Amino acid sequence: MSTIITHRQFPHYHKYTMDLAGRPLTLEVGKLAELANAAVMVTYGETSVLCCVTAAPRPRDGIDFFPLSVDFEEKLYAVGRIPGSFNRREGRPGEKGILTSRVIDRPIRPLFPHDFRNDVSVMCTVMSVDHDCSPEICGLIGTSAALAISDIPWNGPVGALKVGLVDGKLVFNPTSEQRKVSDLDVTVVSTGKKVVMIEAGANQVPNDVMFEAIRMAHEENQKQIALIGQMVAEIGKPKFDYPHADFDQELFQKIVDATMDQAKAAMDTDDKNVREARWNQLIEKWHELFLEDYPEMDKYLEEITYKFQKKIVKAWLLEGHRVDGRQKNEIRPLAAEVGVLPRVHGSGLFTRGQTQVLSVATLDTLSANQKLDTIWEETEKRYMHHYNFPGYSVGEAKPARSPGRREIGHGALAERALLPVIPPVEEFPYAIRVVSEVVSSNGSTSQGSICGSTLALMDAGVPISAPVAGISCGLIQDDDGSFTTFIDIQGVEDFHGEMDFKVAGTKKGITAIQMDLKNDGLTMEIIKNALDITYDARCQILDQIMLPCIAEPRPEVSKYAPKMITLHIDPDKIREVIGKGGSVIQKIVAESGAKIDIDDDGTIHIASPDAESCAIAKKCIDDIVFVPEVGQLYYGRVVRLMTFGAFVELAPGKDGLVHISKLADKRIEKVEDACKVGDMMWVKVTEIDEKGRVNLSHKDAMKEIRAKEAAGEIIK
């Protein structure tokens, strides 16, 4: 019986192309993943990312949030590699994959209807990687296109672009080589009118340059938005209707009318615990007043609380009043301390209001660098920052868990903020890890981690080029478009505000930005205002608190940190230092107790808890790679006597011959008349013949030494 093969056609296949920063961008629909609500294959240069969006047909019961999940899958076949895991499969998402998922999540989430409760899944699978074309940008564009043409309710589309700063010029979607020398890496996502996401790392870039990069990217994004708009017009599906989240507006209004004064009194405090206690008492009052008439009121309590608090906070902020009595540009009380923990390499405690972060710095050898097995170009990290957020920091009783996406994201933000000021490995050959423990949280813990990290690094003696501080800016907008920005947002302002605009940097410029929104985007006026007030605030933090605490990095690393010596040898000598099967280097490590790392270029890093062990290891290596130089003086031991001269050891296993005629100023009959085995003597290298044999002269050495001593030189 023969098999009949039918050639499959793709009747719904569509292809859209445009030029993006000098490279072709292609969006293909209707060929892959036809059963998803929508799927778009994005190809930019030779980078290909499949973006699929699906939605549950019915809302999830019993929730008061939008259940959106975004996954960015890194497939190592995309870069022609097999995973290094035991089963040779990709495992859980790596840090970069999680961070990219968050970058995609942040701009699309605010554009869904606020009362939409259907599960929505966004999955971006990286299938091919051209390092000149960012998979992150492909994921953002593909997700925007897929959601826009799907039947899922969404108020997009958005466009996305990266901007670099190369030789003082702004560059769209910089290539791999340009990124290596770029002073800026900012991702900007925008709708047709506003900017909805900014994520930046920068080498102390001034505000005006950062603003111009954002403005130019927003304008360039309109080309992508126009292309996706064309797709929607030609192949877009009608958006499906959904049941709107249930809410009792009548009950809400009665509660507001009856208890507005008590609610304002409950909110008006700078103590988070007091505010929550007062609010719990207020909820009890609601039960007394309304439970009999509204027996199902408990299922609305969370949303009633949210809407009521937001109503108060918004009205106050628009009037220039904050819940803790501060002015809109006023920072909470600050405190800074270093040397908090006795035996760690460096520690810093940073306090801002009821937010408190303890950061601890640890130094180790370069073998402790984090190895990365990803699709990205970076293969290892020398500077690492980890952020921990235990339940007790917000007064919750919950068990410890492994870091979630939020912890990883906040840790990466603080890491990115400090990276531009970390000294190069040539100047400071240590692996560096900072752990920030959030011990109390009332907003802006990520920015507290940045300040704490700076304190810990300086306390550890890491010669950072400039101290870094971080601060967040909030936003409230009125219905007429007027807005108020306010600095150093605390928890309740973050929860009920429309923006968390985090900016970190030095006095010279910005090192990191992360922007979270709960509205439909920011105008250029708001962005410029946020950049300006965060600059003033971080300078205030540096001048008034951090620098008075520790003005500059300690001159030396902690006595508990490993001592480090760096050598540079001829790469051809590496084999001799390592030895057959590692025998030589293992012997050096055993004898000295030091750790030794050898780079392919001949750079050797020696580390040990004490300087003596480093010195022993260094001498062993110096002896192995020692090459005598003609004309140089050496102080060596006589190891063998022959009738024609004496052999003097210049370094272990390396000796030279002092002919009998070169042993003394006068003629001697026997070598034994001038020296014996074990004697130490000065010798001068007079010749190294073509076979590598070294000829020495004690007579010439002493003549040169006497001349130097007569001239007042000290011979060592």
PLM-predicted stretches and their roles:
Residues 2-56, 241-377, 562-576, 584, ...:
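Extended amphipathic alpha-helical scaffolds
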Residues 3-14, 20-23, 37, 48, ...:
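Alpha/propeptide regions of enzymes that mature by internal proteolysis
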Residues 151-267, 457-555:
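Mobile "lid/hinge" segments at catalytic clefts and subdomain interfaces of large enzymes
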Residues 560-564, 571-716:
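Single-stranded RNA-binding regions, centering on S1/OB-family and related RNA-binding modules
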